[in-house]
Amino acid sequence: MFLNCHSYHSLRYGTISVEDLVQQALDYNIKTLALTDINTVTGIYDFYKLCTANNIKPIAGVEIRIENELYYICLAKNQKGIGEINRLLTAYNCDGIEIPKHHPTFENVFVLYPLQNIPEKLLDHEFIGIRQDELNLLIQPALKKWVHKMVILHPVTFKTAEEYELHKILRAIDHNTLITKLSEGDYCKDTETLVNKKLLLNKYQYEPQIIENTKIVVNECSFDFDFSTPKNKKHFTESKENDVKLLRQLAYEGLSKRYTADHPQAQARVEKELAVIEKLNFCAYFLITWDIVQYSDHMGFMHVGRGSGANSMVSYCIGITDICPLELDLYFERFLNLNRKTPPDFDVDWSWQNRDAILEYIFRKYGKDHVAFCGTNVEFKYKSIFREVGKAFGLPKEELDALAGKPMTQHDDNSVFRLVHQYGKLLEKYPNQRSMHSCGILISEEPITNYSALEMPPKGFPIVQFDMHTAEEIGLEKFDILSQRGLGTIKDTVELIKEKRGITIDIKDTAISKDETKCNEFLSIGKTIGCFYIESPAMRGLLRRLKCDNYKVLVAASSIIRPGVAQSGMMKEYIFRHNNPTKFEYFHEVFKKELGETYGIMVYQEDVIKIALHFGGLSAPDGDVLRRAMSGKGRSLSALQKVKDHFFESCKELGHPEGLSKEVYRQIESFAGYSFCKAHSASYAVESYQSLYLKVYYPIEFMVCA
């Protein structure tokens, strides 16, 4: 019966999170619920999961509004209907095609008009929504004639009286005006909250046809989504078999180039990886990334493949990455294994000068109907919250500055400030606007509008209306297309050297720069200003303290400079142990066995996982939850808490003293959000060497381009 519910994804309008909306429905024993946020489908997948987990039938839809005017409410009969709604919104958002006020072209969508927008005739799938406070209008013959096409309309926008005031504040923020200057059409009615279903039906007891029509709409709507199947582009060629053949061919061609002599260990690694990639149906993902890199090479662009993808020998052989996994003992399983159900995640950097050309190629090659950026929700932040709420209350700039710049305890005597603070606290974590993910591109098999409406931000590339977490959950894994200045400096320097000196440098051949003698001399004394990632005062100081004179030490340095390691005290300890390898004791025997290469210090994500598994006795899946939390990819605090609880339970069972277990977990936690995987550090170290080589041997050209 509740066919028009808003969550806080109705930006600067709704006040209820999807979780709270479903929980409130559960409290009222409501068995069917429709989420119809204003012009967006952002929340429908979280809504679906929460509803089905609580035995509530979910209905997906959208409320179509242009400014303050409600055109109609769209309710999808099925998954096809969601796609039809998405395409209506996409045409408006991206192509500027005006949304029709009546009779949008739908085959699998119910349309509910408000009384204020009734067309001259209604199609079979179109109805009129009538609110309980509008029932008395049915005495008018002009409306009474439509009763046979009416349904119950009870919008839901807020939960409590306090949230109703918050709704008004949001509307004032949206209109950039004062709360007192809002007109009635700017905000919702004070009845727009969930109520007991029986009480609602009682209001319509004298219009049984309206109740019956509502039941018909509810029964004919079905939102059923398969989260388990991959939604990415399935094949690079025309079939899986040809993808397998092409990837194998490219891998062996690259193998012969990367390793000139016969190399049975490398060949065995390639075979092992190809078997896993084929079994998991990820050949297309590798080939699409290879194709993008091929285009980049053809255009003469520099790129760096980094992240966990650099653990892969196949990635190395086909040119996506440039570090040898065997040299650094990098585990392919860290990137891809048979327990992983989602596609791998390649991170590839280009120069900021070339990134747009790469993006344009992707959209052109794979089709605008199948490519879009991930979206991201920009939330209200602390200072901006109080500025925005304060403006809605009419505070002048000086008071806004004071409000945002001082702790609340210093404003206790100001009643308006206390009110602003009260409502501002409610807005924490509320989405304020949608924006473009910095680098995540989605390439889908089916039209991407089957899953989301698209929006067109100022950057000029379309975005989906959900974030990367939702994308991954529904089966869309992103390609990370990043940019940085360092690659542009290297490319420009190489071109300038050729122009001025007539010397061609194959800077992509890492053998000429990595562990080069003179480069290592510069490295060990921190003479690295202008060089990628190793030019900051902190990094130059670290290089000097480590007396860093080779690639492997630079790889470690690239990771221990991160805030998590430094703040935990482990960076200082690593420096001591590196310079005094016989003057320390390992924290525990497990640390000596698993972390001997890094002197018993957790430096990389892999090291943290090793300790969690071998000291804490966690399972591999729990280790992956921990890894994802550390890399910022996890969003389930409850899942992380379960892993933490299990860690301490397991440590107790293994006989570890409680104090020891707490200290180990403290070290693990200090890495959260900051630690690098080893392959990522190695990729950065290669680029550092490339820029250092140019600085050492061609300083004038390098400094001109830096």
Question: Which residues fall in each region the model found?
Answer:
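Noncatalytic, beta-rich nucleic-acid-contacting surfaces in large DNA/RNA-processing enzymes
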Residues: 32-35, 51-54, 191, 239-706
